[in-house]
Regions:
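Conserved alpha/beta-hydrolase
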Residues: 2-23
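Short beta-strand/loop motif that positions the catalytic acidic residue
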Residues: 85, 91-93, 97
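C-terminal catalytic histidine-bearing segment of alpha/beta-hydrolase fold enzymes
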Residues: 117-161
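A conserved short beta-strand
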Residues: 66-78, 88-90
Length: 161
């Protein structure tokens, strides 16, 4: 989020109990209304998350689709059907991700709009999106954490124009 913010994205972090979005799936209620007053020039609102946080973001957006313009999924998939929505969806994961269940990722890919922007970071891993150190079961990254974050930010920034 820090790197996106450096690229003129307003990033709002909603704190979750235990850092797990699944423990408060409605924590984002009222966030847009609150920040529209602070940032009246913002015209597009996106939600995003990493791993389970991404899955929970997708669930939330599916229930509030009229409030959002898009969704960012980092090493995550959506079990909620967003395929007929007008959302701009960005899905980013690493080629060395050992945590993301790729069978489920492929299975649920049909829940996203056909024009979803998808990017596989060559050498990227699951843990680097969370910046919390390597997670048990993750693959061995072939890129540095900073490189992976930079590639993800560049992809989003370029395709958000």
């Amino acid at each position: 989020m820090h790197e996106l913010a450096k690229n003129n994205f307003v990033c709002i972090l909603v704190h979750m109990p235990g850092n797990l979005a699944v423990l408060d799936q409605n924590a984002a209620d009222g966030i847009i209304e609150k920040y529209k007053e602070i940032y009246p020039s913002i015209q597009e609102w996106y939600m995003g998350g990493h791993s389970l946080g991404g899955a929970m973001a997708a669930e939330y957006v599916a229930k509030h689709v009229d409030e959002f313009d898009g969704l960012y999924l980092f090493a995550a998939y959506s079990t909620a059907d967003l395929s007929d929505s007008d959302l701009r969806v960005f899905s980013v994961y690493g080629s060395e991700d050992g945590v993301l269940d790729m069978d489920k990722y492929r299975k649920y890919r049909s829940n996203l709009p056909e024009d979803t922007y998808e990017y596989v970071i060559d050498g990227g891993c699951h843990s680097y999106f969370g910046s919390y150190g390597l997670q048990k079961g993750d693959g061995t990254p072939d890129v540095a954490l900073e490189e992976q974050i930079e590639m993800a930010v560049d992809f989003i920034t370029y395709n958000s124009k």
